[in-house]
Structures are given as structure tokens and as C-alpha cells.
Regions:
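Active-/binding-site microenvironments in catalytic and ligand-binding cores
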Residues: 1-132
């Protein structure tokens, strides 16, 4: 089964991005891959997946206890829905500086389970210097 993770780009989102404090490059609004290695085989995009709705998590890191970790299997694509972009708008100061983040413990557990990809609807799995 394939899950459509398309984010509908509305005229308001485009207008907000054009007037934000930190200009976003054209074409960077929407889904993309941040690849840590130099190669990214296309078959990595065809995986079993699970999407965790963590939109209830506010003012703290997203942690292992916020998801059903037992649903995560080897080579799985694990996605997190926060709804953050709908709250603060794409490209705003808050979008870049106050976005949710995954706890180090959660990231370590996902790596231990040998997942293939992490999907998020916010700027990065960590903030600041830990952004990558």
C-alpha cells in the first residue's frame, strides 16, 4: 500500500513564504530528501511505512512514549505528522527556530531498528546545530 504524503500548497502558503523573515528558495516548498550518503537508491522509496500522529505533542520533544514503537520494523519508512506548518506557516521565523524535534532517544531507537527513512512535516529532526 502506498500512502500519499502530499502537502497541498495553497495560495496563502506561497504568499506567506514570499514575505517571510528568511527568504526560502523557489522550489523548496514541499517534499524533498535530505540524503546523508552520496547515493540514494530509488528502491529506498518503496517501503512499508507507518505514520505517527504526534500533533498533540506541544512544548517538548517528541519521544518514544509518544508513538507505538512496536509498530516500527526493519527497513521501514517512519513518518511523523505534527501539523506544525499549518499552525505557524511555511518560512516564518517560528518555522525555522521553534519547530518540533525528535528526542535523541527516539532517534537512537529508530536507528537501532534499522529503519530506511524518516519523514517529517517540519524543518528538521533537531534544531540549531543539530539540524542535520
Amino acid at each position: 500500500m502506498k500512502i500519499d504524503i502530499t502537502l497541498k500548497i495553497t495560495p496563502k502558503m506561497v504568499k506567506d513564504a514570499q514575505g517571510n523573515e528568511k527568504k526560502a528558495l523557489v522550489g523548496h516548498l514541499g517534499t524533498h530528501f535530505d540524503v546523508m550518503d552520496k547515493e540514494f537508491p530509488l528502491d529506498y522509496t518503496e517501503r512499508k511505512a507507518v505514520v505517527f500522529d504526534v500533533s498533540h505533542v506541544k512544548d517538548r520533544e517528541i519521544d518514544i512514549s509518544d508513538i507505538a514503537i512496536d509498530q516500527v520494523e526493519k527497513e521501514m519508512f517512519v513518518a511523523f505528522y505534527t501539523g506544525f506548518i499549518e499552525t505557524v506557516g511555511y518560512g516564518t521565523k517560528e518555522y525555522f527556530s521553534k519547530h518540533p524535534q525528535l528526542s535523541n532517544e527516539l532517534l537512537e531507537e529508530l536507528l537501532k531498528r534499522n529503519i530506511s527513512m524518516i519523514g517529517i512535516d517540519f524543518t528538521g529532526v533537531r534544531r540549531g546545530k543539530e539540524h542535520t
